[in-house]
């Protein structure tokens, strides 16, 4: 009989989808095992016969499915306002250029976010965070990028820090100051990049407000030379980097990111084979964002077969934002990734667990159920992991465990 220590907690009578690639079964499934949790981490996975059937801190899950906590590795969670009226205009035939000329597009969100005080901005973001937590998310990336000036970018990152301090969900904050050119720099995007590189990145990094730097390398964002200035600045300070690349066109952003050992290349609908090979060589995760693909009614799909062939890890995320993916649901993104991009349910599960953890630099502690990893996991009223992907309108979450505590 396995000896338990005071304070140990056990989950028994479970079907365990570990997502551990070292296990041979699909999803890393094991049966007739129990989880021992100690001090917020997974202490061990042992045969049920080695443990008492009942006792203090022993939870009988009656055969329910247990998976790692979900990880949403790409969100724009902190913003004010919405773009519903603009979406209706687009559906009625208005062009993006026409909407932008009227003050719409990303700068509409920037204006609303700049004008919003920190407390109401926090309350808006907190409600969104809790929606994701209710789906089983235990680690969440939050980007800035709707300030495009030092004060508001800092405000967005302070909101992310306040959310993290609630200890309800892990937050990975990202500085996305190079998201778009603000209206006041419309005729001087290089000048804006200078502001980002010489002021925003070093000052906000010194304050400890973010974990990584992101950018938007695209024809409607920043060109390759401007993007490389951002990457050079970040790398000189030892800051991990990532990027929105190859979403609307092929500029070579994925190859650029990979030269800087980017954590992830996100969107990647127009990614080519040279970019895929560079991502493999640079250890860069491909993050698929099917919500934006759907909402923008795009036609160019990411090169999933190439990513498989080159064995590039693929993550899936919600990309929750007001302009191109207003879906605060990782479950929906999981389903869309299967239906629209052709991922298998097992690939999607890897994409919201171990590969998503890698996209955030957390692969040594998150995204799998194995000894030594954080005790972040979800108990589902389900028998198979595919059930959560198959029916996105139904949430079979039974219990969410964060840092070893039922939450």
From Swiss-Prot:
Write one Gene Ontology MF term.
zinc ion binding
Which positions does UniProt annotate for Fe(3+) binding?
74, 76, 244, 319
Instruction: Please list the cofactors this protein needs.
Output: Zn(2+); Fe(3+)
How, per the record, is the cofactor bound? Binds 1 zinc or iron ion per subunit.
The role this protein plays is: Catalyzes the hydrolytic cleavage of the carbon-nitrogen bond in imidazolone-5-propanoate to yield N-formimidoyl-L-glutamate. It is the third step in the universal histidine degradation pathway.
Q: Where does Zn(2+) bind?
A: 74, 76, 244, 319
Q: Which residues does the annotation say bind 4-imidazolone-5-propanoate?
A: 83, 146, 179, 247, 324
Which Enzyme Commission number(s) are on file for it?
3.5.2.7
Q: Name one GO cellular component term.
A: cytoplasm
Identify this protein by name. Answer: Imidazolonepropionase
The UniProt entry, under Pfam families, shows: Amidohydro_1
């Amino acid at each position: 009989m396995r000896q338990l220590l005071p304070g140990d907690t056990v989950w028994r009578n479970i079907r365990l989808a570990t997502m551990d690639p070292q296990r041979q079964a699909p999803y890393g499934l094991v049966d007739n095992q129990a989880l021992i949790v100690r001090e917020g981490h997974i202490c061990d996975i042992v045969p049920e016969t080695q443990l008492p059937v009942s006792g203090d801190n022993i939870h009988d899950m009656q055969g329910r499915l247990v998976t790692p906590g979900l990880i949403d590795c790409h969100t724009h969670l902190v913003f004010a306002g919405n773009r519903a009226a603009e979406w209706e205009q687009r559906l009625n035939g208005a062009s993006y250029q026409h909407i932008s000329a009227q003050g719409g597009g990303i700068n509409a969100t920037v204006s609303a976010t700049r004008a919003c005080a920190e407390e109401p901005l926090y309350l808006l973001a907190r409600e969104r965070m809790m929606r994701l937590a209710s789906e089983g998310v235990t680690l969440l990336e939050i980007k800035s990028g709707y300030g495009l000036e030092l004060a508001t970018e800092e405000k967005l990152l302070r909101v992310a820090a306040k959310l993290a301090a609630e200890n309800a969900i892990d937050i990975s904050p990202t500085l996305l100051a190079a998201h778009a050119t603000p209206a006041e720099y419309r005729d001087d995007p290089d000048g804006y990049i200078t502001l980002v590189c010489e002021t925003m990145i070093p000052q906000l990094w010194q304050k400890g407000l973010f974990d990584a730097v992101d950018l938007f390398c695209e024809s409607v964002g920043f060109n390759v030379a401007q993007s490389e200035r951002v990457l050079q600045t970040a790398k000189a300070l030892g800051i991990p980097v990532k990027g929105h690349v190859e979403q609307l066109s092929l500029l070579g952003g994925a190859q650029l990111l990979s030269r800087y050992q980017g954590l992830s290349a996100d969107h990647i609908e127009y990614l080519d084979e040279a970019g895929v090979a560079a991502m493999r060589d640079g250890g860069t995760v491909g993050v698929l964002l099917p919500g934006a693909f759907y909402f923008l009614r795009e036609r160019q799909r990411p090169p999933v077969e190439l990513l498989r062939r080159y064995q590039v890890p693929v993550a899936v995320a919600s990309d929750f934002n007001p302009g191109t993916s207003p879906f605060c649901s990782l479950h929906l993104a999981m389903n869309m990734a299967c239906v629209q991009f052709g991922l298998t349910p097992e690939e999607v599960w890897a994409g919201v667990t171990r590969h998503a953890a890698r996209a955030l630099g957390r692969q040594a502690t998150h995204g799998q159920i194995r000894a030594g990893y954080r005790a972040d996991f979800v108990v589902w009223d389900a028998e198979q992991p595919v059930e959560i992907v198959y029916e996105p309108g139904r949430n079979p979450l039974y219990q969410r465990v964060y840092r070893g505590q039922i939450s």
